[in-house]
From Swiss-Prot:
InterPro entries: Ribosomal_uS8, Ribosomal_uS8_CS, Ribosomal_uS8_sf
Family the UniProt entry places it in: Belongs to the universal ribosomal protein uS8 family.
Keywords: Ribonucleoprotein, Ribosomal protein, RNA-binding, rRNA-binding
Keyword flag Iron: no
SUPFAM superfamilies xrefs: Ribosomal protein S8 (SSF56047)
One BP term from GO: translation
Oligomeric and partner information: Part of the 30S ribosomal subunit. Contacts proteins S5 and S12.
Taxonomic lineage: Bacteria, Pseudomonadati, Pseudomonadota, Gammaproteobacteria, Moraxellales
Function: One of the primary rRNA binding proteins, it binds directly to 16S rRNA central domain where it helps coordinate assembly of the platform of the 30S subunit.
Name under which the protein is recorded: Small ribosomal subunit protein uS8
Species of origin: Acinetobacter baumannii (strain AB0057)
One Gene Ontology cellular component annotation held by this UniProt entry: ribosome
GO molecular function: rRNA binding; structural constituent of ribosome
Amino acid sequence: MSMQDTVADMLTRVRNAQMAKKQTVSMPSSKLKVAIANVLQQEGYISNVEVAQEETKSTLTITLKYFEGKPVIEMVKRVSRPGLRQYRGKDKLPSVKQGLGIAIVSTSKGIMTDRAARAAGIGGEVIAFVS
């Protein structure tokens, strides 16, 4: 049985690992997952992203980040899902927690935050909310 929503699986693994106070979390890798992890790293939600290539598969390892014993990521929510895609224009991109969180957006220029997409003047598919 194949997995239907690999991005939701990635976000759930990160959420569960942080609740269990794990230092790292590993999962099967894909270009989309690596791009999302890189955005999370640039925004300071995770410490490190590594992709290890084995014989036939690659593994994505994310090093989680904590502040005073609490996870840096308070909330992570999948928005656009395979059964209901959520596309927004540049003027309708959502703001998460009045700008304290980020929305991860898939645009024609790649995966980026809602702020970067607004600055570039492009919309796209809203993948997830993170705060």
